[in-house]
Design a protein with these regions (language model features):
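Short small-residue beta-strand/loop micro-motif enriched in glycine and branched aliphatics
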Residues: 85-91, 186-187
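Acidic-enriched catalytic cores of C-N bond-cleaving enzymes acting on peptides and small amides
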Residues: 44-45, 60, 69, 90-182, ...
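Fold-independent oxyanion-binding glycine-rich loops
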Residues: 25-26, 55-58, 81-84, 180-182
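Structured core elements
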Residues: 54, 78-80, 119, 176-179, ...
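Acidic/histidine-rich catalytic neighborhood of metal-dependent amide-processing enzymes
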Residues: 1-70
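Alpha-helical metal-binding/catalytic segments enriched in His/Glu/Asp
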Residues: 1-30, 77-81, 94-114, 201
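Flexible glycine/proline-rich, aromatic-decorated loop/lid segments
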Residues: 66-82
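Glycine/acidic-rich beta-strand-loop module
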Residues: 21, 174-205
């Protein structure tokens, strides 16, 4: 969208300022080269600007141009739990030895309450309060829950209570299990107490939240 707007302004001779483009192709792998490149002295002058406009965002719809004023950050990590030094038979050891998959499932299950609220003490301490006026502006966007559900293939939307879908997408932090593994998952069945379990977990963070603190 921004590129087409630039193209139009050049074509109509209405461009009011200089414009610099930075194309970065490593976002999906964590942008390992970008930070190092940006801090080089010879690039600081090249990148100097009054305003930065990020194009890696969505539009409300393909017919409604959108400018995002913020993006949620990310805190991600892997949690690994260990139990016995090898898998055990649940008929012989069930009820006497802690099962890492059971414990991991319980731990993950305590992070969110029934209203979609993250229960970790202090998690929301630094979350900026969005004013009623700002929330009203967010919800003026032409958006439909029904269309959204259809686009992602679900019948019911889920999320933090007392916030709209647009608010939950943009101004509220979230917790998600990105992957979980443990025990036997092959063909057939093995009645075991697994020796370990792990999960890949992520938090989407909002303005003022520090991923190191989280």
């Amino acid at each position: 969208m921004q590129a087409k707007a630039f193209e139009t302004m050049v074509a109509t001779n209405t461009l009011p300022c200089n414009v610099k483009f930075l194309f970065e192709g490593e976002e999906e792998i964590g942008s390992p080269s970008l930070a190092e490149w940006i801090v080089k002295e010879e690039n600081k002058k090249l990148l100097k600007a009054d305003v930065i406009l990020v194009s890696d965002t969505d539009m409300v719809s393909d017919q409604v141009p959108s400018i995002c004023t913020g993006l949620r950050g990310l805190c991600k990590f892997e949690m690994r739990l260990t139990g016995p030094d090898h898998d055990l038979h649940s008929g012989d050891f069930g009820g006497t030895v802690s099962n890492p998959v059971n414990v991991l499932s319980w731990m993950i299950g305590t992070v969110l309450d029934k209203d979609g609220h993250i229960t970790i003490p202090g998690f929301y301490d630094d979350v900026l309060v969005v004013s009623p006026e700002e929330r009203a502006l967010i919800n003026q966007a032409p958006y439909s829950d029904d269309a959204y559900k259809k686009s992602v293939g679900v019948e019911v939307l889920h999320g933090e209570k007392d916030y709209t879908t647009l608010e939950r997408i943009g101004i509220r932090p979230t917790f998600d299990v990105c992957g979980i593994q443990g025990g036997y998952s092959g063909e057939g069945f093995k009645t075991i107490i697994p020796s370990e379990a792990w999960a890949k977990l992520s938090f989407r963070l909002v303005a003022a939240q520090n991923p190191q603190r989280i």
